[in-house]
Structures are given as C-alpha cells and as structure tokens.
C-alpha cells in the first residue's frame, strides 16, 4: 500500500504488517513527518505539505520531536525482543507484555509498557551504512551519503529542510528548528547553508541554573543585549527603538531572528523550564534526558516546528557515554540496567503528555538512532574493565523505531524481523 511504498523509497528498506488507517489529513501528516525515515526528497516534502494544507484547511500547525539516540541502540534489548532465539542472539533480558495487544518490549521499559497503546514500533527498517556518520546521514536525509565517514551529511537533513520550508510562514517569535546540539553526528544542512541550522539549547535543563544563552548579534545592537539584567528590564523599549530606527532593515536574517526571539515573551516562557509544575518535571525524570524531553514538549506546544533532542549520555553513573555498546566500551547488560530506566521515564512521559495535552494530532514523536546492533552478541575484553564482557556491534541490517502522535492509529507493531533479529 501507500505507506509500505513510502518506507521502501530510495533504498531505505521496510515492510509493514497491519494497515495504514485514518483520514487523508492524518496520512498526509504522517508522510510529511516521515521525510527522512522514508527517504523523501525536498520536492516530495513540499508537495506533501501542500497536500496536507489543503486537507486541513490551510493549517501548517504541525510539529515533530525527534529523540535521537546517538551511537545506535540495540533493537534486541529494547523494542524487538527474541526470547525464543539462542541466548547468544536473544540475550538475557526478558520481554514484557504492554497495553498494546501483541506488542512485547524489554522488561527494563515498564513505563513504556503502560503507554504502548499510544505509540507504534516499527521493526522493519534497514540500510547499508554501518558507521555512525553514514548511518545518521542515511537515516536523517533519506539519501545514501556520498562520503559515509564525513561527520556532516552531504544532503540536508530533516530539521534544516523544515526550517527552510517554513521560513516566514509561522510565528517569528519561536524558532522553526531547535536542537540540543549544533548538529547530530552525520547530520547537517548541507547545501541549504548555515541559516537553517538549529537554534541550539546547550547545557543540562535539569541543572538549577539552566537558561538559554544569549544569541550572537551584530555590533550595532550587541552592546544593548550583553547585560542580561538590562535585557530583561528593557525588552519592550528595545523593540520600540529597533522598529523606530528602521535598524531591522539593515541587519541580516540571523539578527532579525535573534531580535524576534529575544523580545518574545512566548519564547522566554517556552524556554524557561523552571516554570513547569514540579509534578510534571518529576514525571519526566529529574535528569538530563527527562528534562530535555519536557523542554521539547514545551517548545512544540509554543509553536516550534521541529525539535531534535539528543539522548546520548544520560548523565548518570553505571553506563557508557552513548548507545554504542561494543563490548570494548561497556557491559551490554550493565549499561542497559543503568540507561534504560532513565530512557523509559523520559520517553513514556513525553508520549503520555502529548496525548494528555491534546497535542497528538499535531505533534509526531520519533525515537531512533542511526542503526541497530548486531543480532549475535560479541564478547570482548573491556577497555576499562579488562575482563571479557558481552556487547553488540554496529548493525544497519535491522533496527527499531518508535513513533507516536501525528494523528496516527497507534498501538501497532509495524513489520518484523527474522527469528534471530537478523533482517526484516
């Protein structure tokens, strides 16, 4: 069907079990939101966005949250458990039932299990690039990278495409594209240029003193914005001064956007995570990943079109720095036991919150990394531990992706892999 073909376009292989249901506007939203997943090109995206506007009365008020799991998570320890496979494939962790009939996931994701009826798991995605940059570039742009080892993609990835496409079409008080890092490894804006890179949120939003740094502005106005206390007390006057002096006409796009953001009450409120109710902050988890997920929700609710939040290092002890769980880097199960409960709380809260706040028709959540991990466990001596320990290596032949919201019919497992998780 139409959705099945979408997953196969431009070589990103996928198969679908179940059906693609829902009215045309929802289907159009899903196709737009799945640009990189399905390998859609920029013309594809523009035509589908136009079609989506027609079917929903001209609205473009849709957003995507991409939770990016840098390093490549193991599908076999998260969303595609193989308890019947030999232990050297299926591993030691066990599956649990969920609120979605027929969907089993890892025992270390019990909060996921409670909200599984609100997301889909796609188990049938694969590609051909087993290095981090190539895998990320392939997944995020929809194209085969020309230089797979280049840390920057040769083709524009989804966030910059959205930023370019929506330039001038949405409320200028919020940035179109926000990310927790300047760029994901293997991502980038490529030929679109630096104007469409994200508005970057650095730091840890869980820290008590967290705030978004000032933007870099042209010399003509920098002196008036260097002092944060002056900025907070004089934003209204700054806006009047800028408008009256026609200075806005003499500075470039970057600085116009900077002034719009710095003088926007909406932006300040959205970025100020300290204004969130403590109960909600606890629900997401008082750690780096949980508060990044919460901040992403605040931003799309305020009008940002595309948010990428990296969940690489959870900022806790017991695990490795990212999802790249080779045996030389760390112990497969020790890392899972440290990492997955943090991940579980953040993602389950985000999914639940999107629905509780009535955002599920306009916001799509995508949770993915650049590839899966080898189905067969590869024990090696750990660089730090100096002992033999289990791990899994890079594997683009099979991977799992979680998607939620976007007006989709949820609670589905889409596609499957072979008995040992080797391929779709």
Question: Where in the sequence are the language-model features?
Answer:
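Ligand-binding pockets and gating/stacking loops
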Residues: 3-424
